[in-house]
Amino acid sequence: MNDFYYSEKPTSPIREKEFAVAWKNKELHFISVSGVFSFDDHLDKASRLLIENYVPSGNMVLDMGCGYGAIGLFLKALYPQLVLTLADINERAVEYAQKNAERNNLWVNVVKSDLYAALNGNRYHDIVTNPPVAAGKKVVTQLIQRAK
């Protein structure tokens, strides 16, 4: 069976890649992992673009489809006042997002959730995402429509 980064329970062998990302006066160290977006030894371009251009509109922020946590964790490092929740359906993503938060001494809430199902109706000022386009139009549409 092939695993996709939006698989709930990846079964592929675990392979890790470590790398650092620097932006402004911050440097974070990440472990990316197979079966999770984006398994590589560097930050993907879309995530970097989002991080570099994000301006908070409030303090409650959700990183939906967080993968190993790069976007949400970097935003927490840049804006420590944010109350950040990182959510992903992928169990391995949730595990590595938590590991990456700990290795960078960042306090965030990491939740396993199928879109918004496990978020208890919480409200957020901002929802950031590098949307899981490979999951298909239906999933991406639900991600947007349920954000209201």
Predicted segments, located by residue:
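N-terminal auxiliary segments of SAM/dcSAM-dependent transferases
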Residues: 1-24, 36
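A generic structural micro-feature
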Residues: 11-13, 44, 102
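A short, charged helix-loop
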Residues: 26-32
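Class I SAM-dependent methyltransferase Rossmann-like catalytic core
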Residues: 32-41, 49
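Residues at alpha-helix caps and immediate loop-helix transition turns in enzyme cores, especially N-
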Residues: 42-46, 139-140
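Conserved SAM/SAH cofactor-binding pocket of Class I
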Residues: 46-129, 135
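A short glycine-rich, Lys/Arg-flanked "PGG" loop and its adjoining helix->strand segment in the class I
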Residues: 141-148
